[in-house]
Every structure is written in structure tokens, then in C-alpha cells.
Amino acid sequence: CENTISGCSRADCLLTHRKQGCQKTCGLC
């Protein structure tokens, strides 16, 4: 998963997606 929304930390996106099975919680992943 990769964060695609400016202003959203990519590291936070990756951690969130690991926990939620790569659901779209931080933009298009």
C-alpha cells in the first residue's frame, strides 16, 4: 500500500493498512 494523498504520512498509511488489511483509510492504496 502507498499513500497517495498529500499531507498524509506514508508511514502512518502503511501502519494503518497493515492493521486493516489494506482498506482505503489513507487515500488510494
Swiss-Prot record:
It is found in: Secreted; Nematocyst. It comes from the Eukaryota. GO terms for cellular component: extracellular region; nematocyst. Keywords: Disulfide bond, Nematocyst, Secreted. Coiled coil: none annotated. Residues 1-29 form the ShKT domain. The keyword Phosphoprotein does not apply. Disulfide bonds join C1-C29, C8-C22, C13-C26. Does not show activity against grass shrimp (Palaemonetes sp.) and brine shrimp (A.nauplii). Does not show activity on the voltage-gated potassium channels tested (rKv1.1/KCNA1, rKv1.2/KCNA2, hKv1.3/KCNA3, rKv1.4/KCNA4, rKv1.5/KCNA5, rKv1.6/KCNA6, Shaker IR/Sh, rKv4.2/KCND2, Kv11.1/KCNH2/ERG1, hKv10.1/KCNH1/EAG1). This peptide is similar to the potassium channel toxin ShK, but does not show activity on potassium channels. It appears that Lys-19, which is expected to occupy the pore of the channel, is not sufficiently accessible for binding, and therefore that this peptide must have a distinct functional role that does not involve potassium channels. It is noteworthy that this peptide is much more stable in the presence of trypsin, chymotrypsin and pepsin than the toxin ShK. Belongs to the sea anemone type 1 potassium channel toxin family. Type 1a subfamily. This is ShK homolog Ask132958.
